[in-house]
Curated annotation (Swiss-Prot):
Family: Belongs to the Mical family.
Domain Calponin-homology (CH), residue spans: 516-619
Pro residues biased stretches: 792-803
Compositional bias per record (Low complexity), positions renumbered to this chain: 918-932
Chain residue ranges for the region called Disordered: 748-830, 892-935
Protein's UniProt name: [F-actin]-monooxygenase mical2
Biological processes annotated in GO: actin filament depolymerization; cytoskeleton organization; heart development; heart looping; positive regulation of transcription by RNA polymerase II; sulfur oxidation
UniProtKB keywords: Actin-binding, Cytoplasm, FAD, Flavoprotein, LIM domain, Metal-binding, Monooxygenase, NADP, Nucleus, Oxidoreductase, Zinc
Length: 1126
C-alpha cells in the first residue's frame, strides 16, 4: 500500500508538472483534464476545487505555488472566499484583463464562466509592465509558471506568455473556461420567472469539430447576474498618425533580456529626435519615434510620417479618408516589409543579424500597419439592466474600455486596475449595495484612470495588493448618484421613476460636497461672472483658464481691491496664474491645484482638477451680490461718497441677518425679498420729514394699507433678529468678521474710541467718568440702530442690589444725558410703533454682546495673572492696593470683628468710588454681601481661616488693608479656575471654510506645501503620501490600517499603537510627579516672602492714604494656604 501511495503521489506530481510546462492553450486544457481525472476532481465544484487539488498535489514545486496563492486568498477583502457566494459571473473574452478579472472574482467566491472564441494564443506583441503589475503577477505565482518572468532589469513580457500564465492560474481556481465559443445575445427573463438568476445567455460553438462537449454544455440556457465584456465605444480624434508593428524571430532563445539598443525601449519621442534625424536625410525614412524590445522575438513599434510612406511606395494612393488610405488594396506588402526592415536596421545601427519575420496565426509574416488617428474609449464602464424586477450588472474591462498603447504598458496597467474596480463593484453588488451608488463609484474611478493615472502614482511596495479602491486610488472625486441615472436601464420608466427610495439614497463616500455642482452649471456661472472683462472669453472649463486672466477676473468680480486687473498681461501666463493661486490661498483658504509654471507648461489644464478648483469659488461666492465691472473707478468715486448715510446700517443688517441663497433662475436682480424687506424697514429713517404724515389714525385708506404692510415687515425682521441671536453662539470666524466689520463701521459714524487694556476684574481701579464726545447728526438720527454696534468695554462687576438696571432706569439715564435724542425717539415711536419693538430687541442684543465681552476680558485677565509665580503675584497685589483709597471706617465693636470689612468696589461703569461708610453701614444688617468675580469651591475652608485671621487683626485702616490682601490671597489659591484660551486676533479678514470647500496648504508631517491633486487626509489632517508613516517604526502605513493617538497627535501602525500608549502613560506619570515636587518646593520657599511682601504693602497703603494719625504696630499673621494641585 505504501508503494502504491508513493506511486500515486509521484504520478500526480508529474501530471501537475506537465500542466505547468504546457506552452499552448489546447495543450494546457488537455493536461488539466488529465490531471483532474487522475485525481478524481470535479472542476464544477468551484468552492472546494482549489482546496481538494492542494491536498492531493504535494510536490515541492506545487507547495511553493500553494503558499503564494494562500497568502493571496488570506486578504480580508475576500472574507475567506465568502464575499460573493451565490453570484454567477460571465467573462466574455479570455484576454489578459478578462482572465485577471475572473481570478479576482473567483477569490471573492463567485461562480465564474469564461468564454473565448479562439483556442490559440498567438499574440507575439511584447507588453511593457508597470512596477505594480509585476508585483501583482508575482503574488499570483508567475515565477512558478515562467521562470524568466521579469528577471533582473527585464520589465516586459509577450502577450501570449502572459495570457497563458493567467489561463493556468484561472484553471487552478476552478474557473470554468470554454474556448471556441462566441457570445451571441441576451435573453430577457419571463414575467412569471421566479428564479433569482435573471438573464439567460445563448452561446454557439465555433466551427471546430472537436468541441462537441462544449456545444452540449452550452446548448441549454445559462443564467448569470453579472456580465463583464460588453460596452459601446466613443472616438477621440487626434492628429493623423500611422504605426507599424513588425516582429522578427529570435533564434537565439538564451538572449532574452536587455538589447544592445536598450536606450530605444519605451522612451518618449523628444529623446529620439536627434537619433532619427540622419535617417530622414539618407534613407528618406521619417519617423516620429520607435520602440524596440527583445524577448522571445524582436519586437518593433514605430510611427512614420505620411509623406515618407508615400515616397517609399508603402501607400499607393493618397486619400483624405484614413480608412481608405490604410485599406489592404492601398498598401503594398512588399514595400511595407522592406520599409520595416530598413527602419529596424537604421534604428539599431545595423547591429541586427539577418532575421526572418515571425508568422502570425493567419500564416503570414507578422507585419501590421494600423491607424491611431482616433483613440477609442467606452462611454460608460458599467450599467444595470432591470427587467420584470430582476437586475443584471454589466461591466467593461480591457481594450474596449480604453484603447491602449501596448508597448508603454498603459493597456495592461489600466486594464488590471479596471479589473480590480470591477471585482470590488461585484463584491458590493453581492452584498446588497444600491445600483446607483455602485455606478457612481465605478464611473468616478474610470475618470481617474483615464486622466490622472501614471506609473509613478502607484507604489508596488504596499504589501499585498487587493481589489479595494483605496489601496490604489486613495483620493478621487466621487460622482453623485444623479449623474449616473441614465445607466440604470429598465422597462419601468413609464410607470415608475428612477428616484425611488432604494435609488436616491446616498452612501457616505458618495456625498462629497465638492462634486455637488454640475460642470455645465459651473460653466454658465463662470461665464456670467467674467462677462465684460477684456481678453477673457470662457467657453469651456479647460483651455479658457490657461492664461490666468479668467481666474483673476473671477476674483476681481467679487474682491476688486485684491487684483489690479488693468495691469495684467495676457502673455504672462505664469504670473497671472500664480497671482490668482496665491490670492485664493491667502484670502479665501483655497489650496492651489498646481503652480503657475506647471499650468503654463501643460497644453490644456485637466478638466476634473479645474472643476474641483472652480467649484470652491462657486460655493464661496454664489450667494454674494454681483459687483459691476468698474473700469472707471476714478469717475465713480464721487458717486460712491455721496451715498446715503444709512448704508452702514444696511451693511450691518446684511451681516446679521441670515442670507438666503437664491437659485440661478430666480436671481434676476440684486433685490431679493429679504433685501426689499430691509429697505422698507428703514425707509422711515431715511425720510424723517414724511413720518408725521403717515399716521395710523388718518383717513387715507392707502396710507393705512402701507402702514400695516410696513408694520408687518418690521415685525418679521425683528423676529428674524431675535431668532438669530437666541440660537447657539456663532462660530469664531463669523464672530471675528462681524466684530471687525462693525468696528470699522463704528469708526465711520462716531468718534474713534480707545479700548482700555484688559484688567483683572478683581483688581479693577475706579475710573473717572469720561464726558461723551459730541455726536454727529447722523448718529442722532439713527440712535436706535447704531446702539447695536458692539463696543469693547472693560469687564463689569455686578453692583450691590439688582443684577442689572431695568429698562425704565436706562431710559431715564438716556433722557438725562441726551434729551434731544429722547424726543426724537419718541417722535419716531409715535410714528412707527414697530420701531420701538425693534429698538428693544437691539438693546437686548447689546446686553448680550456686553456680557460676552466681559467674559472674554475676565478670562484673559485671569489667565495672565495665573501665569505669574508667587512672588510676582504678591508684588502685583501690593502695587494694586498701594494706590487705592481705602474706606475710612471707624472702629467697629469687638462683637463684629469676625466680619469681613467691605472692599471698595471698582468698575468701569461706576463713575465715582463709594462714599465713606459710617459705623452703622458696617453692621451685619446693613452691610451688603459682596460676590467674588470668580466661582470657587470650599466656602467652609475660607470661613474657618478668615475667622482666625480677623480675630488676630487690629481695627482701623490696618485691618482693612490686611483684610483686602488676605481675601484676595484666599480667593486666588482656593479657586480652581481655568479660563478658556482666547482665540488670537487675525489681521486679515480671512473667511474660514468647511473641510469640503477649503483645504490645508501644508503637510501635517513635513510642513511643506501639499497640493489638492496629491494630498491625502486622515483625522482632519492633510499630508503627502510618502510622509504618512508610523511615528514609532517609520514604516509607511495605509489609510485603512492606522491608529491615531489623540494625546500626542501621532499616527501609528496597529502593532505599535499599544506600545506607544504604554510609553506615554509612564512618561506622563513621571512628568506629573516631577512637576508636583517642584511646585511644592517652590511654594514652601516662597510662602514666607509672599506673606512679608503682602504685609509691607498693606502698611504702605495705610500710610499713603492721607491720614496723619499715628497707628500702633500690632503683630499679626496670615494663615498658610496649601497649594491646590490637580
Amino acid at each position: 500500500m505504501g508503494e502504491n501511495g508513493d506511486d500515486k503521489h509521484g504520478r500526480s506530481g508529474q501530471l501537475f508538472e506537465n500542466f505547468i510546462q504546457a506552452t499552448t492553450c489546447k495543450g494546457t486544457l488537455q493536461a488539466f483534464n488529465i490531471l483532474t481525472r487522475q485525481l478524481e476532481l470535479d472542476p464544477q465544484d468551484h468552492r472546494h476545487f482549489y482546496a481538494k487539488l492542494k491536498s492531493k498535489v504535494t510536490s515541492w514545486k506545487a507547495k511553493a505555488l500553494w503558499n503564494k496563492l494562500d497568502k493571496k486568498h488570506g486578504q480580508k477583502e475576500y472574507k475567506k472566499g465568502k464575499a460573493c457566494i451565490g453570484t454567477k459571473c460571465l467573462i466574455i473574452g479570455g484576454g489578459p484583463c478578462g482572465l485577471r478579472t475572473a481570478i479576482e472574482l473567483s477569490c471573492l467566491g463567485a461562480k465564474v464562466v469564461v468564454v473565448e472564441k479562439r483556442d490559440t494564443f498567438s499574440r507575439n506583441n511584447v507588453l511593457h509592465l508597470w512596477p505594480y503589475t509585476i508585483h501583482d503577477l508575482r503574488c499570483l505565482g508567475a515565477k512558478k509558471f515562467y521562470g524568466k518572468f521579469c528577471a533582473g532589469a527585464i520589465d516586459h513580457i509577450s502577450i501570449w506568455q502572459l495570457q497563458l500564465m493567467l489561463f493556468k492560474i484561472a484553471l487552478l481556481h476552478g474557473i470554468e473556461i470554454h474556448v471556441n465559443v462566441e457570445f451571441m445575445k441576451l435573453l430577457e427573463p419571463l414575467e412569471d420567472q421566479e428564479n433569482q438568476n435573471i438573464i439567460a445567455l445563448f452561446c454557439t460553438e465555433s466551427e471546430s469539430p472537436d468541441n462537441s462537449e462544449c456545444k452540449t454544455r452550452l446548448s441549454a440556457p445559462v443564467v448569470f447576474r453579472c456580465i463583464v465584456g460588453i460596452g459601446g465605444d466613443h472616438s477621440f480624434p487626434n492628429t493623423l498618425a500611422f504605426a507599424f508593428i513588425y516582429i522578427y524571430m529570435n533564434r537565439n532563445k538564451e538572449a532574452v533580456g536587455p538589447s544592445p539598443v536598450w536606450a530605444l525601449a519605451g522612451r518618449p519621442r523628444p529623446l529620439h529626435t536627434a537619433l532619427l534625424q540622419p535617417g530622414r536625410q539618407q534613407n528618406r525614412i521619417d519617423l516620429e519615434n520607435i520602440v524596440y524590445y527583445k524577448d522571445s522575438t524582436h519586437y518593433f513599434v514605430m510611427t512614420a510620417k505620411k509623406q515618407s510612406l508615400l515616397d517609399k511606395g508603402v501607400i499607393i494612393n493618397d486619400y483624405a479618408d484614413a480608412e481608405m488610405l490604410l485599406c489592404a488594396e492601398n498598401v503594398d506588402q512588399d514595400n511595407l516589409q522592406s520599409y520595416a526592415r530598413e527602419a529596424a536596421d537604421f534604428a539599431t545601427n545595423y547591429q541586427l543579424p539577418s532575421l526572418d519575420f515571425a508568422i502570425n496565426h493567419y500564416g503570414q509574416p507578422d507585419v501590421a500597419m494600423f491607424d491611431f488617428t482616433s483613440m477609442y474609449a467606452s462611454e460608460n464602464a458599467a450599467l444595470v439592466r432591470e427587467r420584470h424586477g430582476h437586475q443584471l450588472l454589466v461591466a467593461l474591462v480591457g481594450d474596449s474600455l480604453l484603447e491602449p498603447f501596448w508597448p508603454m504598458g498603459t493597456g495592461c496597467a489600466r486594464g488590471f486596475l479596471a479589473a480590480f474596480d470591477t471585482a470590488w463593484m461585484v463584491r458590493s453588488w453581492a452584498q446588497g449595495a444600491l445600483p446607483l451608488e455602485l455606478l457612481a463609484e465605478r464611473i468616478s474611478l474610470l475618470i481617474f484612470l483615464n486622466h490622472r493615472l501614471t506609473w509613478q502614482f502607484l507604489n508596488p511596495k504596499k504589501g499585498l495588493q487587493t481589489c479595494h479602491p483605496n489601496v490604489w486610488i486613495p483620493s478621487h472625486a466621487l460622482r453623485l448618484s444623479h449623474h449616473v441615472k441614465h445607466l440604470f436601464i429598465t422597462n419601468e420608466l413609464q410607470t415608475c421613476s428612477l428616484e425611488r427610495a432604494s435609488s436616491i439614497r446616498r452612501s457616505v463616500g458618495v456625498s462629497r460636497h465638492e462634486s455637488d455642482v454640475r460642470p455645465n452649471k459651473l460653466l454658465i456661472w463662470c461665464q456670467k461672472q467674467t462677462e465684460g472683462y477684456g481678453n477673457v472669453t470662457v467657453t469651456n472649463l479647460t483651455s479658457s483658464w490657461k492664461s490666468g486672466l479668467a481666474l483673476c477676473a473671477l476674483i476681481h468680480r467679487f474682491r476688486p481691491e485684491l487684483v489690479d486687473f488693468g495691469s495684467l498681461k495676457e502673455d504672462d501666463v505664469v504670473g497671472n496664474n500664480q497671482l490668482a493661486f496665491d490670492i485664493a490661498e491667502r484670502e479665501f483658504g483655497i489650496s492651489p491645484m498646481t503652480t503657475g509654471k506647471e499650468m503654463a507648461a501643460t497644453e490644456e489644464p485637466d478638466k476634473l482638477s479645474m472643476v474641483l478648483y472652480l467649484s470652491k469659488f462657486y460655493e464661496l461666492f454664489r450667494g454674494a451680490p454681483l459687483r459691476p465691472v468698474d473700469t472707471a473707478s476714478k469717475d465713480n468715486g464721487d458717486a460712491r461718497s455721496a451715498k446715503p448715510s444709512n448704508l452702514i446700517v444696511n451693511n450691518y443688517l446684511n451681516l446679521t441677518l441670515p442670507r438666503k441663497r437664491v437659485p440661478k433662475d430666480e436671481k434676476t436682480s440684486d433685490d431679493s425679498d429679504l433685501n426689499k424687506r430691509r429697505k422698507t424697514v428703514f425707509r422711515c429713517f431715511e425720510e424723517p420729514a414724511n413720518v408725521p404724515s403717515r399716521n395710523v389714525n388718518s383717513g387715507n385708506e392707502c396710507n393705512d394699507t402701507k402702514e400695516v404692510i410696513n408694520q408687518n415687515k418690521v415685525k418679521s425682521m425683528a423676529t428674524q433678529l431675535l431668532a438669530k441671536f437666541e440660537e447657539n453662539a456663532p462660530n469664531t470666524s463669523l464672530r471675528r468678521q462681524e466684530s471687525l466689520t462693525l468696528s470699522e463701521a463704528d469708526q465711520a459714524v462716531t468718534a474713534p474710541l480707545t479700548d482700555p487694556p484688559p484688567v483683572n476684574p478683581r483688581f479693577a481701579k475706579p475710573q473717572e467718568p469720561t464726558p461723551s464726545p459730541p455726536q454727529a447728526e447722523t448718529k442722532r438720527q439713527f440712535q436706535a440702530v447704531s446702539r447695536t454696534q458692539p463696543v469693547v468695554r472693560p469687564p463689569v462687576q455686578p453692583r450691590p442690589g439688582p443684577a442689572k438696571p431695568t429698562r425704565e432706569l436706562r431710559v431715564v439715564e438716556r433722557a438725562q444725558s441726551h434729551p434731544d435724542d429722547l424726543g426724537r425717539s419718541e417722535s419716531l415711536s409715535s410714528a412707527c410703533p414697530s420701531a420701538l419693538v425693534l429698538s428693544n430687541i437691539l438693546e437686548r442684543l447689546q446686553d448680550l454682546e456686553e456680557k460676552a465681552q466681559q467674559k472674554r476680558a475676565q478670562n484673559l485677565a485671569n489667565r495672565d495673572f495665573h501665569k505669574k509665580n508667587i512672588k510676582e503675584k504678591a508684588a502685583h497685589l501690593a502695587s494694586l492696593f498701594g494706590s487705592v483709597d481705602l474706606p475710612k471706617n471707624k472702629l467697629p465693636s469687638l462683637g463684629f470683628s469676625h466680619h469681613s470689612p467691605q472692599i471698595p468696589y471698582s468698575s468701569s461703569r461706576t463713575p465715582d468710588p463709594p462714599p465713606p461708610s459710617s459705623s452703622s453701614d458696617s453692621s451685619p444688617s446693613s452691610a451688603p454681601s459682596r460676590k467674588s468675580g470668580m466661582s470657587w469651591k470650599g466656602s467652609t475652608f475660607f470661613s474657618k481661616h478668615s475667622l482666625n485671621v480677623w480675630i488676630l487683626m487690629t481695627v482701623g485702616k490696618v485691618s482693612s488693608g490686611i483684610g483686602a490682601v488676605a481675601e484676595v490671597l484666599v480667593n486666588l489659591y482656593m479657586c480652581d479656575h481655568k479660563p478658556k484660551p482666547k482665540s488670537s486676533h487675525l489681521g486679515s479678514l480671512r473667511k474660514e471654510f468647511p473641510a469640503n470647500i477649503g483645504g490645508s496648504d501644508t503637510c501635517y508631517f513635513c510642513k511643506r506645501r501639499v497640493y489638492v491633486v496629491e494630498r491625502l487626509s486622515a483625522e482632519g489632517h492633510f499630508f503627502h503620501r510618502e510622509c504618512f508613516k508610523c511615528a514609532f517604526c517609520s514604516t509607511s502605513i495605509r489609510l485603512g490600517n492606522y491608529v491615531f493617538n489623540v494625546e500626542d497627535g501621532n499616527f501609528y501602525c496597529q502593532p505599535h499603537f499599544m506600545h506607544s500608549v504604554t510609553k506615554n502613560k509612564h512618561r506622563k506619570r513621571r512628568t506629573e510627579s516631577k512637576a508636583q515636587l517642584e511646585e511644592d518646593k517652590t511654594w514652601r520657599s516662597g510662602e514666607a516672602e509672599a506673606a512679608e511682601v503682602a504685609t509691607d504693602s498693606a502698611y504702605s497703603a495705610c500710610s499713603s492714604s492721607g491720614d496723619s494719625s499715628p497707628v500702633p504696630l500690632v503683630p499679626f499673621n496670615i494663615p498658610v494656604l496649601d497649594p491646590l494641585i490637580g
